[in-house]
Amino acid sequence: MKVRTLTAIIALLIFLPILLKGGLILMLFAFLLALIALKELLNMNMIKFLSIPGLISALALIIIMLPQDAGEWVQVIQLKGLIAMSFIVLSYTVLSKNRFSFMDAAFCLMSVAYVGIGFMYFYETRSEGLRYILFAFLIVWLTDTGAYIFGRLMGKHKLWPVISPNKTIEGFFGGILCSILVPLVMQMFVDLHMNIWLLLLVTIVLSMFGQLGDLVESGFKRHFGVKDSGRILPGHGGILDRFDSFMFVLPLLNILLIQT
């Protein structure tokens, strides 16, 4: 418990100033977190990060995370670059004489999309304003807190025992219920540019998909037989263990709220 608490304090002391500052430093921080998260995923599948497919995946990740407002050249690089990376990774299945399988290639490409899109929207959301990233973080935090409390007090029906045996249906809906507090309170202080009823609906959707993101990462770990995605955060696991919900919440937040 002491290690877990100390890790959380140190992480917050590093993370919060960068989040508040935003801009280039946050974007570079997002790239760093994404590369670590990609390494964690590849390690689960016994693919070394410092290997040909690992390094190609890392390059593809950087390409997919390039800022969208940098100009048309970014979209050109992303399209042509990702097509080229896909062909190279697929070709390596032959060059490696099937030691690197087609399933491994598909896993690399899926990992790049999963991690890259999630962390790209991390800094893109912050660039739209601190209120939006705060909105996302509070939804995820209150959902997790509510799911834990309701699950402990009332949880009797397992949500998905094969993937995450501790999660319950009562906790799932308890998390959604607690997340509703976020827009109700935030609208008193900041303008989120949406009717409160629509905002409540968006919050419910984000809470549901945040929990789904948690289950997806749990599914990865269960499939590959690992307890945590990594060990970079003592007592907390890896980067993916901390950001799994945001992989789903942040892209959806941009689609449903920011880009509307």
UniProtKB/Swiss-Prot annotation:
It comes from the Bacteria. Keywords: Cell membrane, Lipid biosynthesis, Lipid metabolism, Membrane, Nucleotidyltransferase, Phospholipid biosynthesis, Phospholipid metabolism, Transferase, Transmembrane, Transmembrane helix. GO terms for cellular component: plasma membrane. PROSITE patterns: CDS. InterPro entries: PC_trans (IPR000374). It is found in: Cell membrane. The chain crosses the membrane at residues 9-29, 46-66, 70-90, 102-122, 130-150, 172-192, 196-216. Its EC number is 2.7.7.41. It catalyses: a 1,2-diacyl-sn-glycero-3-phosphate + CTP + H(+) = a CDP-1,2-diacyl-sn-glycerol + diphosphate. GO terms for molecular function: phosphatidate cytidylyltransferase activity. It is a multi-pass membrane protein. Pathway: Phospholipid metabolism; CDP-diacylglycerol biosynthesis; CDP-diacylglycerol from sn-glycerol 3-phosphate: step 3/3. Pfam families: CTP_transf_1. The keyword Ion transport does not apply. One of its GO terms (biological process) is CDP-diacylglycerol biosynthetic process. Belongs to the CDS family. This is Phosphatidate cytidylyltransferase.
